[in-house]
Regions:
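Sec-dependent signal peptide cleavage junction
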Residues: 17-27
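N-terminal lobe/hinge region of extracytoplasmic solute-binding protein
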Residues: 33-83, 221
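Aromatic- and charge-enriched surface segment that lines or borders ligand/interaction sites
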Residues: 77-140, 177, 268-274, 329-335, ...
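Gly/Pro-rich hinge or "lid" segments in bacterial periplasmic/extracellular proteins
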Residues: 149-165, 169-174, 179-257
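Extracytoplasmic/peripheral linker and loop segments enriched in polar/acidic and small residues
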Residues: 152-154, 164, 341, 345, ...
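Ligand-site clamp/hinge motif
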Residues: 193, 211-217, 244-293
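Append "and occasionally in soluble cytosolic enzymes with long acidic Gly/Pro-rich linkers
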Residues: 240-241, 333-451
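A bilobed periplasmic-binding-protein/Venus flytrap-type ligand-binding module shared by bacterial periplasmic
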Residues: 240-245, 262, 309-338, 355
Length: 521
């Protein structure tokens, strides 16, 4: 098992109480505004929230969740688990259809579609971002995946494996079987994830390299609640009810109309108030103004904005930003333990979260990366089990000015000796399409520079792109210090450890204290 490296500062924030308007009036069309465009329709390779949301609307999975969070049949009518042989056998619903973007039927959905998807996913040349989740639980999948990979220079190639060794089989057209590596009590929750979605083999072969390319809505098939009937990048997306869907009678919205505007976060509230769109996220500042306005007070309601996403501030140990931001100097600074500890105690989490929740910021702060109420056993919440109970019970306010300055004073002397220059430039980008992120960054900048001094640190707040932010900024390493998030891939707390393993997008394994004398992690 890979070594877990804890590098995040302030594993804390669940954005649970942003205000969002209710639907303005009854309509068969649901209209929204958006500023972050998708960059791929390939649900088997993507790993971005925007593209997950699209896939969830247009691709059905074996099971689904009801409004109570309970697993219910979807493309699988029923299933059985054989504990002795570690197999899950799913009975696929007969009559489910694949349709094209214009709604015409292309083929039946069969068990073979899930096998085809697995083979595509496990071909390392297709560069799926979620293949690791699949091969972590399915027998033979990791060995097959490694056998398709290209060895690094000086590395021996892995043995090429036959796909028959992978634990996914179509017993017949409507019987699908998975064999697990080991018992996995949360496996049913995993099959709702993108890496377990099906794909039609004939269509996949027909499209070839164009499968899932985000230039046309005709580059994927649809079997879910909606069809992406119109796709004009950076203009509009229209989802139309899939009349052939097996559960069509329970799809109550006829169309979803999404209009692109790079200023969506700014324009959406007033467009909603004028009745031009049906929902909009609004900041706490706007919420306060509207609640004081009798004509608007009834238009809004609080919502749990981000479900079970948690937010944390991360240091980047492999900076790849422009020279003007002094990445080499940042490397020296971030590799100093006392420098990092200074920020742990120096960041006033309550003050930064007042941008999102001015009345009760403590309500959206916690001490565990796994949020409360995510999973419980015998009525006991996971965050209240064992040693986690002590961590949960700690004060959420970690700010301690005296300790922060003590650590920073030590760090400054150590960094001078190591050749660092001051002030240390800290590039902190944000996604302009995310409500109040810019304001939060400004608060953090002012608070931290006010504490440590602008002669010690220079936090540079910079807007990243609205579309493709994850790829262009976080995955490219173009940040020093940034708010990041993580959402669950399946219903087990283990899913929240992923951002803190080696090989993630803040590269904790490159921290010098984790390297041996040969520079190997």
């Amino acid at each position: 098992m890979k070594r877990i490296v804890a590098i995040a500062l302030s594993l804390c924030v669940l954005l649970s109480m942003l205000v969002m308007p209710a639907v303005a009036e009854e309509s068969a069309a649901y209209r929204t505004l958006y500023s972050g465009e998708i960059t791929s329709l390939n649900y088997l390779t993507t790993a971005t929230t925007n593209e997950f949301a699209l896939a969830a609307n247009v691709i059905d999975t074996l099971v689904e969740y009801d409004k109570y969070g309970q697993v219910q049949p979807s493309l699988a009518e029923s299933w059985e688990y054989d504990a002795e042989n570690l197999t899950y056998t799913f009975k696929i619903r007969e009559g489910a259809k694949w349709v094209k973007a214009d709604g015409t039927v292309y083929a039946d959905v069969t068990a073979n579609d899930f096998v085809t998807a697995a083979k595509y996913l496990l071909d390392a040349q297709n560069a799926s971002s979620t293949a690791n989740i699949f091969y972590s639980v399915i027998a033979g999948a990791e060995a097959y995946y490694l056998g398709t990979s290209t060895p690094e220079e000086g590395q021996e190639p892995y043995p090429v494996m036959d796909f028959e060794t992978v634990g996914v089989k179509a017993i017949d057209d409507y019987t699908l079987q998975y064999t697990l590596v080991e018992p996995c009590p949360y496996f049913l929750s995993m099959v709702t994830y993108v890496c377990f979605m099906p794909v039609n083999a004939e269509f996949l072969a027909e499209k070839g390299a164009d499968f899932g390319v985000a230039t046309s809505n005709e580059n994927i098939l649809y079997n879910g609640a909606f069809v992406l009937s119109t796709f004009e990048p950076q203009q509009k997306r229209v989802y139309t009810k899939n009349a052939t869907n097996w559960d069509a009678e329970n799809i109550l919205i006829e169309t979803i109309e999404q209009t692109y505007n790079k200023e969506a976060g700014t324009l959406a509230p007033e467009m909603y108030a004028r009745g031009e769109i049906d929902s909009a996220d609004i900041s706490s500042t706007i919420a306060a103004e509207w609640l004081a306005d009798e004509t608007k007070a009834d238009l809004i309601r609080p919502v749990r904005q981000s479900g079970f996403y948690t937010y944390f501030v991360a240091f980047n140990f492999d900076p790849n930003f422009d020279a003007e931001y002094e990445p080499e100097n940042w490397k020296i600074a971030v590799n100093n333990v006392n420098f990092r500890k200074a920020f742990y105690y120096g960041l006033d989490r309550v003050k930064s979260k007042m941008v999102m929740e001015p009345d009760n910021p403590e309500a959206i702060l916690f001490n565990t990366v796994t949020p409360p109420e995510f999973v419980s056993i015998n009525g006991v919440d996971y965050t209240e089990m064992g040693a986690l109970a002590d961590i949960t019970a700690l004060e959420t306010e970690t700010f301690n000015e005296e300790k922060a300055l003590e650590y920073m004073n030590v760090a400054v002397e150590e960094l001078k000796a190591a050749g660092a220059t001051f002030p240390v430039k800290m590039l902190m980008p944000y996604n302009p399409s995310s409500s109040a992120w810019a304001e939060e960054c400004v608060v953090m900048e002012q608070q931290l520079e006010g504490l440590f001094g602008t002669d010690v640190i220079d936090i540079i707040v910079e807007a990243g792109p609205s579309s493709g932010f994850l790829k262009e900024v976080r995955r490219s390493g173009k940040y020093a210090f940034m708010k990041c998030n993580w959402g669950p891939d399946y219903a087990d707390p283990n899913t929240y450890t992923d951002p803190f393993y080696d090989g993630t997008y803040n590269w904790p394994e490159l921290a010098t204290e984790y390297l041996d004398e040969n520079g190997v992690s």
